Structures are given as structure tokens and as C-alpha cells.
């Protein structure tokens, strides 16, 4: 009987070993994360990773931020690394720039980028130009971040898009996330960069949840600054946007697809340095271009893209003039109906695409 039992147990042990060897842990599933939570997670991971990183701004600490983007960080890291400041943008931006020059890595939050005008000398003259003026000897590793562009019912002094303003300045890097993956990957890359980086968020996107893929859940996840992403493949026309209008472009593309028009939608992610190569490659394939932005038309991001295409190799591939969809050339009105008509809507993008394709 012992011999028989041994003969039985032997194969069972072998089978058990095979089962164990074949067992593997499944990859982490995608999770739903709001843009607000993604920025918070990215800052939290970098604060934990590098003790030189700190956050300062109005109400970022005990109040968890005006838009709750810094929720929980003050309780975790304390007064020395999450710092409430007086209402003086020039003052706390200057402190942040000085700290960056001294070797720290500050994250300077503006409650809205409209208020960054109070600190424009610190951002442009002190932060953006110093690395170059010092022949590369004095880096200024600082992130200026906060909500940018149109919001809801806050009128002209709280609704301006500053992508073109800051994208105009050599020495700055400018990023503009759309979804949660963008937000987390770009804030982490911005914090680690030795150049001053302006991160233009959008108040209306903070509470919007997106699927965060498994790779983006890693603490090592970064999105390279200066690289765009094709959000939707297409063959008939290239549509380029950044920030919230990317979502509008995808909605328009879905509508147009039902009519047999396939749009290639490019999410810029970075305003400066701009990934013009990605746009050129797409235009060479589709032979048509529409740009979409929430900012004003004159000297805007779309105008720069059109100029680059005209001056580069993709121009000879265009079958029709490029078309821009922009915000209205007026200060943002307060009245709801006027406000809605002052920023690009899905119908405006559809109209521009059909105009470009002569449909």
C-alpha cells in the first residue's frame, strides 16, 4: 500500500509544481481618476521621492487648495513643505524662484493664471532667462501651475488662456494637459526638469474622471515634455488641440466619422517646445489641417502651428488652406449665452472640418 501511495503522491506533487509554476499575477487594471486626483497623485509621489520638492501658494495647505488639488498634502508633509502664502503673487513667486536658484524644487501655484500677471517679472525675467544668462551654470527648476483658460461664470479677469503668452518666451517650457494621464505624467516631468515649467491646467477639467492605464499608475511614470499624442487615428484631416478642446475635437470626430469623415486628433500636451514633427507627419498623411484652441486668435497657438506648417515640408502636402478654431476676439463675457459663444464648441469644429474639406 505504501508503494501504491507513493506512486500516486509522486505525480500529484509534480502536477502541483506545474500549477504553481504556471500561476502568475495579472497586470494591474486601469482605474478611474479625476484630473484633480491625478495632479495630486503626481505631486505626492514627487514630494515623497525628493525632499527638495515643496509646494507654496494661496490656500494650498490647510484648506487643501482653492480647487482641492493639494488635498491631504499638508497633513502628510507639514508646514515646511506645503506652505500657505499671503495674497501676493509677486512676493511668493519671487520666493519660489529664489528657492529654485538655491537648489530646491518649488511648485508655485497660482489660484488662476490670470493672477500670474502680478508676478510676470518673476516668471519671465527671473525664472525664464537666468539659465541662459548664466551660460547654463544656474538652473531654475521651478513649476508654475494652476487653472488656465475659460471657466464658468467668472468673466474676463478669470477666464483668459495664457498658452500663447508663455509659449512665446524662450527659457520656459509650457505644458497643457487634457486628461488624467497627461496631468500626472506632465506634472512629474515638470518637477524633475531643471528648466522653469509652466503647467496650464483647466478648472473645468479638474472634476472630470478618465481611465488611468496601468503603466500610468507607476511612481516612475513620466510623459516626456515636448511630445504630442495622437488620440484618434484618421486619414482625411488633422485636428490639433490642447487642454479641454481636445475632448471637443474627439466628440466632433465621432460625429464626423458617422458621415464618413475620419479625423486624426492630436493632443499637443506641450506648447513649448512644440512637437511640430508629429503635426507635420499627420498633415503629410491627411493633407488637411484644423487647429483648435480656447485662446484668442491673434498671435495664438493655432497661428504658430499654421506658420510652422507653411514654413516646413508639410506645406506642399496641403490640399486646402489650414483653418483655425479659436476663442472669440473679445474679453470673456459674463452672460452665459455670450460666454458659450466665446469659446469653441463641437459644432464649430465640425463646421471648420467640413469647410476645410469643402463639403
From Swiss-Prot:
Which amino acid positions bind thiamine diphosphate, per UniProt? 89
Say if the entry is tagged with keyword Mitochondrion: yes
Look up the EC number in the record and give it. 1.2.4.1
Annotated catalysed reactions: N(6)-[(R)-lipoyl]-L-lysyl-[protein] + pyruvate + H(+) = N(6)-[(R)-S(8)-acetyldihydrolipoyl]-L-lysyl-[protein] + CO2
Quick one: which residues bind K(+)?
A: 142, 190-191, 193, 195
Q: Which leading EC class covers this enzyme?
A: oxidoreductase
Q: Which residues carry this modification: Phosphotyrosine?
A: 67
The protein's matches in InterPro entries, at most eight in alphabetical order, are given as: PDHB_mito-type, THDP-binding, Transketo_C/PFOR_II, Transketolase-like_Pyr-bd, Transketolase_C
Q: Where in the cell is it found?
A: Mitochondrion matrix
> Which terms in the GO cellular component ontology are assigned?
acetyltransferase complex; catalytic complex; mitochondrial matrix; mitochondrion; nucleoplasm; pyruvate dehydrogenase complex
Which residues are recorded with the post-translational modification N6-acetyllysine?
A: 354
Task: Name the domain of life this protein comes from.
Answer: Eukaryota
Entries under PANTHER family matching the protein: DEHYDROGENASE RELATED, PYRUVATE DEHYDROGENASE E1 COMPONENT SUBUNIT BETA, MITOCHONDRIAL
Complex formation:
Heterotetramer of two PDHA1 and two PDHB subunits. The heterotetramer interacts with DLAT, and is part of the multimeric pyruvate dehydrogenase complex that contains multiple copies of pyruvate dehydrogenase (E1), dihydrolipoamide acetyltransferase (DLAT, E2) and lipoamide dehydrogenase (DLD, E3). These subunits are bound to an inner core composed of about 48 DLAT and 12 PDHX molecules. Interacts with DLAT.
Its protein name is Pyruvate dehydrogenase E1 component subunit beta, mitochondrial
Q: Which gene encodes it?
A: Pdhb
Amino acid at each position: 500500500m505504501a508503494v501504491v501511495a507513493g506512486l500516486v503522491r509522486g505525480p500529484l506533487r509534480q502536477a502541483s509544481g506545474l500549477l504553481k509554476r504556471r500561476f502568475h499575477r495579472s497586470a494591474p487594471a486601469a482605474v478611474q481618476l479625476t484630473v484633480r486626483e491625478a495632479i495630486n497623485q503626481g505631486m505626492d509621489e514627487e514630494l515623497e521621492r525628493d525632499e527638495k520638492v515643496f509646494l507654496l501658494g494661496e490656500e494650498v495647505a490647510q484648506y487643501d487648495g482653492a480647487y482641492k488639488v493639494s488635498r491631504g498634502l499638508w497633513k502628510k508633509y507639514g508646514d515646511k513643505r506645503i506652505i500657505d502664502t499671503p495674497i501676493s503673487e509677486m512676493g511668493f513667486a519671487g520666493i519660489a524662484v529664489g528657492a529654485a536658484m538655491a537648489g530646491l524644487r518649488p511648485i508655485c501655484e497660482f489660484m488662476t493664471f490670470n493672477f500670474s500677471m502680478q508676478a510676470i517679472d518673476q516668471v519671465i525675467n527671473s525664472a525664464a532667462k537666468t539659465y541662459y544668462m548664466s551660460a547654463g551654470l544656474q538652473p531654475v527648476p521651478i513649476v508654475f501651475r494652476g487653472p488656465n483658460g475659460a471657466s464658468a461664470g467668472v468673466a474676463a479677469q478669470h477666464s483668459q488662456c495664457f498658452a500663447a503668452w508663455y509659449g512665446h518666451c524662450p527659457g520656459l517650457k509650457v505644458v497643457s494637459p487634457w486628461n488624467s494621464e497627461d496631468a500626472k505624467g506632465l506634472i512629474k516631468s515638470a518637477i524633475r526638469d531643471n528648466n522653469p515649467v509652466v503647467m496650464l491646467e483647466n478648472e473645468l477639467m479638474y472634476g472630470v474622471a478618465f481611465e488611468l492605464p496601468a503603466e500610468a499608475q507607476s511612481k516612475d511614470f513620466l510623459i516626456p515634455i515636448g511630445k504630442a499624442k495622437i488620440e484618434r487615428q484618421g486619414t482625411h484631416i488633422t485636428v490639433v488641440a490642447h487642454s479641454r478642446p481636445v475632448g471637443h475635437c474627439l466628440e466632433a470626430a465621432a460625429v464626423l466619422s458617422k458621415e464618413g469623415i475620419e479625423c486624426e486628433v492630436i493632443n499637443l500636451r506641450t506648447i513649448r517646445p512644440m512637437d511640430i514633427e508629429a503635426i507635420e507627419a499627420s498633415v503629410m498623411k491627411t493633407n488637411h489641417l484644423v487647429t483648435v484652441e480656447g485662446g484668442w486668435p491673434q498671435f495664438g497657438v493655432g497661428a504658430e502651428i499654421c506658420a510652422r506648417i507653411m514654413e516646413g515640408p508639410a506645406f506642399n502636402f496641403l490640399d486646402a488652406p489650414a483653418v483655425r478654431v479659436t476663442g472669440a476676439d473679445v474679453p470673456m463675457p459674463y452672460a452665459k449665452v455670450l460666454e458659450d459663444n466665446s469659446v469653441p464648441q463641437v459644432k464649430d469644429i465640425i463646421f471648420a472640418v467640413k469647410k476645410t474639406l469643402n463639403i
